[in-house]
């Protein structure tokens, strides 16, 4: 019995410092109700401040981005004609921007005429003969014609939804043309559907049966906005449009025999 008491005493003495009394062993502070209340209030206040800050950030971020892009665009466009006015001694901010807008407007009027279209056609033929420059011009023109208000030159005819890449999954695309496939079982109408990836000039082309294409009630510009915004401008409800009423007469059709594929 005495040996057990000695062992217990030695074990307690080993856990203490030489000058520390056993009664003065460190004890954890009691968890008082006041400290718990303070912690709860601090957590609620921190959560409230964080949510309000994020709400303000979400509200101000698109406004700031819109303002910065608009300001940069105005300064960029204003820089085309501002040096001319500065040489004339006229220093009015925004005058170059207004001049650029009016210049673009009158160029559009001139390009719509027979003389203007002829002049621009000759200039285009000259650019297409220049190495390296012709590739840049061709890519940028395809993007501009995709959103052109002229229905005779619009590259994208309709917005399309196709089943891709697997059954049960869908992808947005644009119908660019149609083709008639001749087989032993008859003819099948196919549509050339361009499925872009960001950016808009990079993507894949699929030949899809016209009966399997879903034509939504979306304009070309709305479809471009959906793709450029990575789906953030997607409407909550998309309805189907009848193909017989939505097909444009300028959409040309090509007949491709099967033995040529």
Swiss-Prot record:
Organism per entry: Arabidopsis thaliana
UniProt keyword list: Membrane, Transmembrane, Transmembrane helix
Locations listed in the record: Membrane
PANTHER family linked: COV-LIKE PROTEIN 1, PROTEIN LIKE COV 2
Keyword hit for Zinc: no
Signal sequence interval, chain numbering: none
Main location per the UniProt record: membrane
Protein name (record): Protein LIKE COV 2
Location of the region described as Disordered in the Swiss-Prot/TrEMBL record: 1-38
